[in-house]
Amino acid sequence: PPHLAAIAPWEACSDWYRDQVCRGGIPSGGFFDELVNMLRVPNGIEDIHAMLDRFPYINEYWDKEKRVAFQNIRVPTYLVASWTSNVHPYGTLRAWNRISSKEKWLRIHNTQEWPDQQTPKYRDELRDFYNHYLRGEDNGWEKTPKVRLSLLDPMGPDVVDLPVEEFPLPDTDYRRLYLNAEEQSLAWEPQTVESSRSYHCRPLNTEPVD
């Protein structure tokens, strides 16, 4: 909208189908059944699980209505994601890479989203971001590093708010891994022996269906 001056998608969702209800091609609507039961609003809430049952494959509903038009986002943006959640990082990091904003910041933290959002330091940062763009305050926000990462260390304290020039890191070494169903492992080389595994995939709180 023309009046929108800045946005701060913290722990965002930008593609409902690919990031949430059918990640990896596996339908999973149970989590949203729980959300519908927990969230009470006067005018109701969309039943995403029911829509997944109605439209199990990618179509205009998922791609037009439930996927962000990244190219249309041009306002200053402050995005936040984490390494520790399996819900929001995909959507947030995809948005970071694809939005058209020239003024954008990314912070990847090392905790769960709710404690991070309530940390005084980061609440103050968010206030500075909005005050800078909505009120025109000269508070030094533009000097904030464009990208800050967290490095998780299982043997010691994590490194937090590490400034880097860009993300993904330019010297990232992307490697392809191959499934080995027989050994239930990942291998560096393509597998020459055919193997398979089967499993039951069922929604939360339901009985297995053969």
Region spans (language model):
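C-terminal, loop-rich substrate-recognition/catalytic regions characterized by aromatic stacking residues
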Residues: P115-D210
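Active-site-proximal cap/loop segments of hydrolase catalytic domains
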Residues: P1-E142
